[in-house]
């Protein structure tokens, strides 16, 4: 396999994600129509050169080197394809805010995998890229929907293979995501969780997940209300999110069917009917404002096509 010519450019667009949705801890996630865009360019130099230039929506520019997740993912592609690494530049337009529970790390991993693979004319299958993504991230609930799109349930089977189920999301159910101007790292959110949980809590979550998935499939409001409930992680994580429980209560009082921490937080996901969306959004922002936290709460649609790439120039 030959090294791509200098100047070849690939554009990769990767959606944000909301994970867990309450009871689906570390196994359920949905892609949302908020995106990070990556432009990969083959540049002069050896495989130890990786230039990462990031531009956020607030106009700030940041740089990252070989320690960045994008580069680590690209390295995995080179290793799996038995390819000598080559110099790359990645320019990133950041719309997915980091450390907010919207899968920003997953976008970096997925983009690095797809970009490095595409610039070499895709020697690795999508299945292999999924395997690598889960291995790098350590859990599947963000990277799988980020790559594939839609609502995805991912579990390791008795044969230790990852099994992915594309679940249905009824058109009548809308998502409002309240995104605060505060950060919470996934590692910090995991530290507060117990190593062991009561069997009764595990059983409760299994039942709730079944109700939620059926509610999302059929649009049954009662099933969503009863199923968007968690005993495994949220009871321990709410205390890390300033004003979080007040925001949840405000959303429910404004007509939300259910409310959950998005991923590890601090963003909060509310599911509702379209006609209640504006009230839910305004109530969540106001509740956080009363706790001294600035936020925004946009409507975000479930994105069904996953990550996409295109060749800008070169062969």
From Swiss-Prot:
Pfam families linked to this entry: GHMP_kinases_C, GHMP_kinases_N
InterPro entries noted in UniProt: GHMP_kinase_C_dom, GHMP_kinase_C_sf, GHMP_kinase_N_dom, GHMP_knse_ATP-bd_CS, Homoserine_kinase, Ribosomal_Su5_D2-typ_SF, Ribsml_uS5_D2-typ_fold_subgr
Pathway(s) per entry: Amino-acid biosynthesis; L-threonine biosynthesis; L-threonine from L-aspartate: step 4/5
GO CC terms: cytoplasm
Binding-site residues, ATP: 97-107
Assigned protein family: Belongs to the GHMP kinase family. Homoserine kinase subfamily.
EC number: 2.7.1.39
Catalytic activity: L-homoserine + ATP = O-phospho-L-homoserine + ADP + H(+)
Localization: Cytoplasm
A single GO BP: threonine biosynthetic process
Keywords from the named record: Amino-acid biosynthesis, ATP-binding, Cytoplasm, Kinase, Nucleotide-binding, Threonine biosynthesis, Transferase
Source superkingdom: Bacteria
Organism: Prochlorococcus marinus (strain MIT 9301)
Name the UniProt record assigns to this protein: Homoserine kinase
Keyword Nuclease carried by entry: no
Primary gene name: thrB
PANTHER family associated with the record: HOMOSERINE KINASE, HOMOSERINE/4-DIPHOSPHOCYTIDYL-2-C-METHYL-D-ERYTHRITOL KINASE
SUPFAM superfamilies (alphabetical): GHMP Kinase, C-terminal domain, Ribosomal protein S5 domain 2-like
Role summary: Catalyzes the ATP-dependent phosphorylation of L-homoserine to L-homoserine phosphate.
A single MF term (Gene Ontology): homoserine kinase activity
